[in-house]
Amino acid sequence: MGKRFSGVSQTMSRFRGWIQAGATLLTNLHLPNFLKGGLYQGAGKTVCVPGLNCYSCPAASGACPIGAFQAVVGSSRFSFSYYITGFLILLGVLLGRFICGFLCPFGWFQELLHKLPTKKLSTKKLKPLTYLKYAVLLVIVFLLPAFLVNDVGMGDPFFCKYLCPQGVLEGAIPLSLANSGIRAALGKLFTWKFSILLAVIVLSVLFYRPFCKWLCPLGAFYALFNRVSLFQMKVDKSKCVSCGRCARACKMDVDVTKTPNHTECIRCGMCIRACPTNAVCFRYGFGSGKEKENAATLRENNKA
């Protein structure tokens, strides 16, 4: 049975930045490796972390799920891919895009950039771009590594190699700064990916989490489970006064009263803090039929 916890919801949303910082630290525990210019290669690297965090980051405690998935898809052996796929499905069912909002290091990085005091631009008219990330997931993460293979049947990790800005931020830059050999070997591919990183940085200052909205394949995968995950948004129709504050507060362009578990909702809790009547909160568990009926009634009332 689902549980509503308004007090917990308020606390989680209020301290979300600290939770993001803690999650980033836990994902990157081996900080001395930044000075050494080496990678942690212990048992932790056989386990995937939930967010987008590069395997090649000197401090990384675990493997990136997208990188690990591509590694097995691009090989002739698929015994390990079942573990990775099952791991991602489990996280999707348990948490959905809560991972994006609370546990992803690169999502937090974009949010910090967006806090810089400059003019901000809305993404509401750019909603069609949100479908790009599903194409990235299907084509670049899965199809290209699986079917564009060399003579020995190995495919490249196309997303990691050609598109992922996190790999440059966490991997290439710190490793090249600490290692002259790596620095001397940097070429056109590094220039290309560094340009992507710069573009994401600039866009993140102007737009809220642009990479998450438009290009992140991990976010696309978790989004597929947002409507069925155990961690969901709950709107109490008896408390809602249809003021629209929650929709205006949402930087992911979601109206929680109409679609409380929209694929773009990252469970950041901004709507919870904006609601003047405490009608919105997190809910964890399986919803009852009455709750679903109330949600449907609320959507109908908002249309009226």
Provide a role label for each language-model segment.
Residues 1-257, 263-304:
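Non-ligating segments of multi-cofactor redox enzymes
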